[in-house]
Swiss-Prot record:
Keywords: Decarboxylase, Lyase, Pyrimidine biosynthesis
Entry GO terms, CC: cytosol
Gene behind this protein: URA3
Transmembrane segments: none
Top-level class of the enzyme under EC nomenclature: lyase
Pathway: Pyrimidine metabolism; UMP biosynthesis via de novo pathway; UMP from orotate: step 2/2
Positions bound to substrate: 42, 64-66, 96-105, 237, 255
Any one of the GO BP annotations: 'de novo' UMP biosynthetic process
Organism: Magnusiomyces magnusii (Yeast)
Record family assignment: Belongs to the OMP decarboxylase family.
InterPro entries: Aldolase_TIM, OMPdecase, OMPdecase_AS, OMPdeCOase_dom, RibuloseP-bd_barrel
Protein name, as recorded: Orotidine 5'-phosphate decarboxylase
Chemical reaction(s) catalysed: orotidine 5'-phosphate + H(+) = UMP + CO2
Active site: K98 (proton donor)
One MF term in the entry's GO annotations: orotidine-5'-phosphate decarboxylase activity
């Protein structure tokens, strides 16, 4: 188990002190709703996405999307309706975009084009390969969006945006290990106003700030399964108990919730309960 100073703290306690507004919002939601389950909805039609989000909504803290695989995507029929479901059920939206280009390019990818991700995704993620410029570009887009919305004088609730860095992946043979992971943590440390966590298999080594306090990184872990070991395409599954005990804060589950022969409501409850039980055992 990780020796992290954060690992035994309740989500509600961490929500009071976290350096990121987006992370504070997520931690409070998780505590209030008693769930650390993120539903990874890798489906290819808007109808599938919205149906699953509605069925799983009561049991999750977050929906993870790959919006660019939606074959019939339109902003009004896909995004607007997904955001409405997020409000209905009380979950956040994480667009798993995995940005990986220079700062100016990712700024435009995040804010413009067909998807306009910054307008609706509370959270997105990025590779650290391009260096710090990728974080700066995404942060600029987020800040410009927030300022433009405030200038309109409309609803300003939940405008904050947060970034997660890809520190480790769950696929077999992943190159995101060792020095890559270490450098990714360094980048996050230098940009903790915007970066609040990692996609990782284990808890990241913590860094003390100038006042001697340890930074609090949220760890989101994919490749979690209660039944399967893998998928034949390199995905490797680990148990809920294992990832939570190793310091993960959010378990990301996809096909385990809605794969062939699975009832999303039944599986949503099962994974929610398993994740919460493992978390309570960790903090007690």
């Amino acid at each position: 188990m990780s020796t992290s100073t954060q690992i035994t703290k309740p989500y509600s306690t961490r929500a009071l002190t976290h350096q990121s507004q987006t992370a504070r919002r997520l931690l409070k939601l998780m505590s209030d709703k008693r769930t650390n389950l993120c539903a990874s909805l890798d489906v290819t039609t808007s109808a599938e996405l919205l149906s699953l989000a509605d069925k799983l909504g009561p049991y999750i803290c977050m929906v993870k999307t790959h919006v660019d695989i939606i074959s019939d995507f339109t902003y009004d029929e896909t995004v607007v309706k997904l955001v409405a479901l997020a409000k209905k059920h009380g979950f956040m939206i994480f667009e798993d975009r995995k940005f990986a280009d220079i700062g100016n390019t990712v700024k435009n990818q995040y804010s413009k084009g067909v998807y306009r991700i910054v307008e609706w995704a509370d959270i997105t993620n990025a590779h650290s390969v391009p260096g710090e410029g990728i974080i700066n570009g995404l942060r600029e887009a987020a800040n410009e969006y927030v300022e433009s919305e405030k200038a309109k004088g409309g609803e300003c609730e939940n405008l904050d945006r947060g970034l997660i860095m890809l520190a480790e992946l769950s696929s077999k043979g992943s190159l995101a290990t060792g020095s890559y992971t270490t450098k990714t943590v360094e980048l996050a440390h230098n940009n903790s106003d915007f970066v609040f966590g990692f996609i990782a298999q284990n808890r990241m080594e913590e860094v003390q700030d100038s006042e001697g306090n340890y930074e609090d990184w949220l760890i989101l872990t994919p490749g979690v399964g209660l039944d399967d070991k893998g998928d034949g395409l390199g995905q490797q599954y680990r148990t809920v108990d294992t990832v939570i005990k190793n310091g993960s804060d959010v378990i990301i589950v996809g096909r385990g919730l809605f794969g062939k022969g699975r009832d999303p409501v039944v599986e949503g409850k099962r994974y929610r309960d398993a994740g919460w039980k493992a978390y309570e055992e960790r903090i007690n």
